[in-house]
Amino acid sequence: MLFKNILFASSGTAGSDNAAKLAFGLAEKQQAELTLYHCCGVPSRGFTTNVTDTRSGSLEQPDEAYQEMVREELNTAYAYQIEACTRPFRMELSVGMPSTEILRYARQIKPDLIAASDPNAARMRSIVGNTVRAVAKKAPCPVLIVNRPCTTCWHLFSNIVFCTDFSEAANHAFRFALNTARQLNAKLYITHAVDITSIQGMTMDQSEIERHTEQMREKIDKLYLSKLDGFANAEVIVREGIPYVEILKVARENEADLIVMAHHSSDLSDDDADIGSTVEQVVLRSACPVASVTRPEAR
């Protein structure tokens, strides 16, 4: 099985509905263990024991009655997914800073995948909120960011778009994309978009464009095609333009149901690099889930 242990990081709001559907669906298809994890309250400042509810913003006393109320509300919110899923699942609650608590629990149970979404997607210019951003940066496994309904994911993923800028971080993402495509018998599109914004002021004629494109294809052949190890269902696509625009075009043209990207594009250490702007723009506009991969041990 590709995923044996899935952690669904729920905000407890409607913003997590799409991630919930995918997490429960993947757990059912993969016969995986599933944990629904919700950080229900952020401790208030001062000497009070009250917490600020992460859904309503109200002050609450984090006693047994409050936690039982939260459990009932989560069971109601995800009643359809819970009823449809034949796999047992755990529901875990915590109090603290959401990103810190999610990462702490992830280190404890060692999931293969974290599914999450940004509850403020509809009103935030930046789709990747502080919690998702922090989790994606430090997570010990791939983080699947789901902000729109995935209509093709119920049968798992059949068309996977892997995007590379040839950084070390992209190598980690490639291993995850290849492993996923191999185990699910999916088509893998290895994609690179030449950033035209980095060559402004330069005029390239058609022969130069073709030569540059061929160089990128040769680089893909050396770095990635040579490591397919018998996997034959792969296609190389090289485009020129604004990277996130071209990535979304490739995904749309090939009916992708998963995009795999490195969490960051530069060769910074995993702990120093913030989520890349291209990833953020893809997440904002993608019609399918986006897997952010940070670390080499990602499966």
List the predicted regions and their residue ranges.
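Small/aliphatic-rich secondary-structure junction motif
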Residues: 1-57, 158-206, 229, 233, ...
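A short acidic, glycine-rich active-site loop
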Residues: 56-72, 207-216
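Hydrophobic alpha-helical membrane-association signature
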Residues: 19, 173, 216-220, 278
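Structural beta-alpha unit
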Residues: 1, 41-44, 60-64, 76-114, ...
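General small-molecule cofactor/ligand-binding pocket signal
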Residues: 35-37, 90-94, 144, 189-191, ...
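Structured core of small recognition/catalytic domains
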Residues: 187-258, 273
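Gly/Ser-rich helix-loop-strand patches that form or flank binding pockets
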Residues: 2, 25, 29, 99-153, ...
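Active-site phosphate/pyrophosphate- and oxyanion-stabilizing loops and adjacent acidic/basic residues
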Residues: 24, 79, 133, 178, ...
